[in-house]
Amino acid sequence: WGSKSSSNWNQAVSVMTSKNGGSFYGNDVKKGGCFYVEYDGNKDDLELILQSWSGGASWAKVSISESGSANGHRYIKCSYDNCVSAFGTSDFSGKLDQVHVSAKSGNITVYSVCYIY
């Protein structure tokens, strides 16, 4: 994707799920994996948000399970369990409609968003 930037309380990245014509597959979100976001900005000054208009939590902010540095950038990981806890269900293929990465109080540049195992 290259990189995407945003300032406080705006989305740097918004990806629709495949059931809505987008490129992210909700059925990829499985136990044992996590969302991985690589970015520049203040430490942990971003949010992973799972959005649903199909019966899941409408705007679920997922807690960060790990953060650090890699490839000259910062990263966060949000575990499967944290995703289920925030979203209220494990039915990501049926109820997840969009994934967002949002800046909190500062500016961020996002380089990568993926679900890893």
Enumerate the predicted regions with their spans.
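Extracellular ligand-binding interfaces
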Residues: W1-K95, A103-Y117
